[in-house]
């Protein structure tokens, strides 16, 4: 589908909604809204182990993380065992991963599906929404937007 067909989040230019998510996997911290206003811009990636396009974007997330971009993950309607298998197989670019087990945070963010990625400013303001999987050609644009937000 054309990206213009997707519904954009109403939160662009707004602070991230208040939330606190438990860890999605053992050994990795969960995620709270306060973690997204820590003075550094970062990407927030909604994903699911069951999501085929999430697997396809894994190399691009790895490339962004290797370039120094902090990426936090939100595992959507998933269980810890499947999230762990996904990370073991496709890589783990995430600094933290929160478990959105019932999809409530996805609704609060205005996300229309997975994968979906947001650029969050150092003060916790949502700057950009990338709908769908990040493709190789999207990496330079996201990297530039992240650097501009610093």
What are these regions (language model features)?
Residues 39-42, 47-50, 113:
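Short pre-active-site segment immediately N-terminal to redox-active cysteine/selenocysteine motifs
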Residues 88-93, 100-150:
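Thiol/disulfide oxidoreductase modules built on the thioredoxin-like
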Residues 49-56, 116:
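C-type cytochrome heme c attachment motif
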Residues 43-44, 71, 117:
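Hydrophobic beta-strand anchors of alpha/beta hydrolase catalytic cores
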Residues 55-91, 100-107:
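Structural microenvironment flanking redox-active thiols in thiol-disulfide oxidoreductases
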Residues 19-43:
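A short beta-strand-turn-helix
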Residues 1-22, 150:
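N-terminal targeting signals for export/organelle localization
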Residues 18, 68, 94-95:
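A generic structural signal for alpha->beta connector loops
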